[in-house]
């Protein structure tokens, strides 16, 4: 059914199509083989029939970009063993694929600090409940500016997230077979590759400005990885017959009323 056909029968049409496409980072190398949108991977392991039914899990070191619950969920699936997921309703084809998962290191990157992370306390703590995963945070990444301190005062959830991250940073190294590193103040600037495939992700070290924002320091690091998952948000897709601003990723509107042109 087209929008024009619906207009013949309805006085108003509400478009609640959501944002389903993975946002891109806008950096060189995103088209190399081994780059994935988190939403695509979530669709795979949730068994969504609109997504791939098989997945390349040959990467031993993986980068996950983003510091929200989606990035945690993707990291958890990559770091856990397939057998640990049998208590869930994991589809058979996903279990079979994850049995072949070779990931031993998962590196999560956020360009700002702990107080700006969008994790929920429960999700962050659950990450550490698996006996096969060691969550690692560099003590040097536990840093706060004035705005960060105020954010902790203003929201208990933010303070709990910071406390959990601090506890990860303070403990002694463990012997779990899978390592999950959470890196703050690292802004991805390029995905590197050879022969068309991901070989590393390059980040720039950032520092807090005092208001919760960050500035690049000009110090760069290349992290050897064979796959990159971006969990940096979702982008709405256009609807046939409705104007769409690709730059702003919105339907041109006036107070919510879609403009004809």
PLM ranges: what are they?
Residues 33-52, 191-197, 209-261:
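FAD-site-proximal beta/loop scaffold in flavoenzymes
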Residues 8, 30, 57, 101-104, ...:
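Structured loop/turn residues at beta-strand edges in well-structured enzyme cores
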Residues 5-12, 57-59, 215-226:
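Core beta-strand elements of the Rossmann-like FAD/NAD(P) dinucleotide-binding domain
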Residues 72, 76-221, 252-257:
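Dinucleotide-binding/catalytic capping subdomain of oxidoreductase cores
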């Amino acid at each position: 059914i087209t929008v024009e056909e619906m207009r013949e029968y309805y006085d108003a049409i509400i478009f609640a199509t959501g944002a389903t496409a993975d946002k891109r980072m806008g950096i060189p190398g995103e088209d190399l083989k081994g780059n994935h949108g988190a939403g695509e991977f979530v669709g795979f392991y949730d068994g969504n029939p609109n997504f791939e039914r098989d997945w390349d899990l040959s990467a031993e070191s993986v980068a996950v970009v983003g510091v929200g619950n989606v990035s945690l969920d993707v990291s958890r699936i990559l770091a856990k063993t397939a057998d640990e997921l049998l208590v869930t309703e994991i589809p058979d084809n996903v279990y079979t694929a994850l049995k072949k998962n070779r990931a031993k290191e998962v590196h999560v990157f956020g360009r700002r600090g702990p107080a700006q992370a969008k994790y929920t306390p429960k999700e962050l703590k659950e990450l550490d409940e698996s006996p096969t995963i060691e969550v690692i945070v560099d003590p040097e990444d536990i840093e706060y500016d004035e705005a960060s301190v105020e954010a902790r005062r203003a929201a208990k959830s933010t303070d709990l997230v910071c406390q959990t991250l601090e506890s990860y940073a303070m403990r002694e190294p463990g012997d779990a077979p899978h390592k999950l590193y959470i890196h703050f103040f690292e802004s991805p600037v390029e995905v590197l590759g050879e022969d068309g495939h991901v070989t590393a992700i390059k980040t720039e070290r950032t520092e807090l400005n005092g208001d919760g924002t960050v500035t690049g320091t000009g110090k760069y690091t290349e992290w050897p990885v064979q796959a990159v998952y971006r969990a940096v948000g979702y982008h709405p897709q256009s609807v046939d017959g409705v104007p769409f601003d690709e730059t702003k990723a919105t339907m041109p509107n006036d107070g919510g009323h879609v403009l004809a042109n």
